[in-house]
């Protein structure tokens, strides 16, 4: 059984962060946080709670770096804390990236850190009362995602939940684009890599049979990276890619492929301070598009999140929660666009198709 998006993720949320969980917690819901602890970190907190006021917290997850490092788990009801459960082990490191996953099960939360089981916490209050997640402390988050094994596939794209709202303005028609000859960097034959759709490699996120994880753990990605897009693209389909640009990066690219053709080529080039978009049909590149509404959104040595939304007439692209561009379809049969390729001077941390 595959996991499906229960709601759109929060991208680069500002800490402290509090946000709603659409529909509340449900059995089978997996909540994944990816971020980095600060080098001076003492502690941070993830709360699953009822409403924004914090008086009722079903699950308080609190890593503390003092005293050798340990993690406190607890529940607060009507403003009163219950007995603490302490795990005298610290799975996080100061100043280092992490992936933290919570799986809601009938009788407990299961917690994974960097794809390894860490702790389980028995429910003290009904989990369906939880409708809010709150994160605070000495950390920086790249995203919070929500995946549900019981949810049907959503073919209608819901409102984006970037921590800062994304605006997708219409692109003025009739704009002329500059034409240049271009060969993409880091080409690799697709037959060299076979990856099953958004399933963890290697290892297993949770021991629950029949529920494979959707989010790759950080070490599982290799560049170039390929994965199929099940059933191809369709209007409202979205793809999210997060990662880190290497400090000495020259370029990288994201390709949406249709067999041997490339329907959408997104190619940040740092030496040119440009983001090139193009289509390749029968090994021939079309006219490049380079214009941007603002400045170059990618930086060497910095993390990024790219959100690509397929609409009926175009792709809409947001970077770090901000609209970057639209790209009108040149290959019209969207369903045949069924492979994602990422390559170049980056480290991948998250892919969601």
Swiss-Prot record:
Domain Galectin: 17-147, 225-353
Induction notes from the record: By viral mimic polyinosinic:polycytidylic acid (poly I:C) and lipopolysaccharides (LPS) in microglia. Up-regulated in macrophages following infection with Mycobacterium tuberculosis.
Tissue: Accentuated expression in liver and thymus of embryo, detected in embryonic heart, brain, lung, liver, and kidney. Highly expressed in adult thymus, small intestine, and liver, and to a lesser extent in lung, kidney, spleen, cardiac, and skeletal muscle. Barely detectable in brain and reticulocyte. Expressed in placenta, uterus and decidua during pregnancy. Expressed in CD4+ T-cells with higher levels in iTreg cells than other T-cell types and sustained high levels throughout iTreg cell differentiation (at protein level). Expressed in myeloid cells in lung.
Region Disordered: start-end pairs: 167-186
SUPFAM superfamilies tied to this protein: Concanavalin A-like lectins/glucanases
CDD domains named in the record: GLECT
Gene Ontology cellular-component annotations: collagen-containing extracellular matrix; cytoplasm; extracellular region; nucleus; plasma membrane
Chief localization: cytoplasm
Deleted gene: phenotype: Increased natural killer (NK) cell activity with enhanced degranulation, higher expression of NK cell activating receptors, increased frequency of intermediate and mature NK cells, and greater production of interferon-gamma following murine cytomegalovirus infection. Defective iTreg cell differentiation with impaired Foxp3 expression, reduced stability and suppressor function of iTreg cells and reduced frequency of iTreg cells but not natural regulatory T (nTreg) cells in lamina propria.
A GO molecular-function descriptor: enzyme binding
Gene3D superfamilies: 2.60.120.200
Gene Ontology process terms (BP): cellular response to virus; chemotaxis; female pregnancy; heterophilic cell-cell adhesion via plasma membrane cell adhesion molecules; immune system process; maintenance of protein location; negative regulation of CD4-positive, alpha-beta T cell proliferation; negative regulation of gene expression
Residues annotated to bind a beta-D-galactoside 2: 265, 269, 279, 285-291
Keyword Secreted: yes
Keyword list, A-Z: Chemotaxis, Cytoplasm, Immunity, Lectin, Nucleus, Repeat, Secreted
Location within or outside the cell: Cytoplasm; Nucleus; Secreted
Lineage top rank: taxon: Eukaryota
Residues the record lists as binding a beta-D-galactoside 1: 47, 60, 64, 74, 81-87
Domains (record comment): Contains two homologous but distinct carbohydrate-binding domains.
Subunit structure: Homodimer.
Official protein name in the record: Galectin-9
Organism (species): Mus musculus (Mouse)
């Amino acid at each position: 059984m595959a996991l499906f998006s229960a709601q759109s993720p929060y991208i680069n949320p500002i800490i402290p962060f509090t946000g709603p969980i659409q529909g509340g917690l449900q059995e089978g819901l997996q909540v994944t946080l990816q971020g980095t602890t600060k080098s001076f970190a003492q502690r941070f907190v993830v709360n699953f709670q009822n409403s924004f006021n914090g008086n009722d917290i079903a699950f308080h997850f609190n890593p503390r770096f003092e005293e050798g490092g340990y993690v406190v788990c607890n529940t607060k009801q009507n403003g009163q804390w219950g007995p603490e459960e302490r795990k005298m082990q610290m799975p996080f490191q100061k100043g280092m990236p992490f992936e933290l996953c919570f799986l809601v099960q009938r009788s407990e939360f299961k917690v994974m850190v960097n794809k390894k089981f860490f702790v389980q916490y028995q429910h003290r209050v009904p989990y369906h009362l939880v409708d809010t997640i709150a994160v605070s402390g000495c950390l920086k988050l790249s995203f919070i995602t929500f995946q549900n094994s019981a949810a049907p596939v959503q073919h209608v794209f819901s409102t984006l939940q970037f921590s800062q709202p994304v605006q997708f303005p219409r692109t003025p028609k009739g704009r002329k684009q500059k034409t240049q000859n271009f060969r993409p960097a880091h080409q690799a034959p697709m037959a060299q890599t076979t990856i099953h759709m958004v399933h963890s490699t290697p290892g297993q996120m949770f021991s629950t049979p029949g529920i494979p994880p959707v989010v790759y753990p950080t070490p599982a990605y290799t560049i170039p990276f390929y994965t199929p897009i099940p059933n191809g693209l369709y209007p409202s389909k979205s793809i999210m890619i997060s990662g880190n640009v290497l400090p000495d990066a020259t370029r990288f690219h994201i390709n949406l492929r249709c067999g041997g053709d490339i329907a959408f080529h997104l190619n940040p080039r740092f030496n040119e301070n440009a983001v090139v978009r193009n289509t390749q049909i029968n090994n021939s590149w079309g006219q490049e598009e380079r214009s941007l509404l603002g400045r170059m959104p990618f930086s060497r040595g910095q993390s990024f999140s790219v959100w690509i939304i397929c609409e009926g007439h175009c792709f809409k692209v947001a970077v770090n929660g901000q609209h970057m561009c639209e790209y009108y379809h040149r290959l019209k049969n969207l369903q045949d666009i069924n492979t994602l390729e990422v390559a170049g001077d980056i480290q991948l941390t998250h892919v969601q198709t």
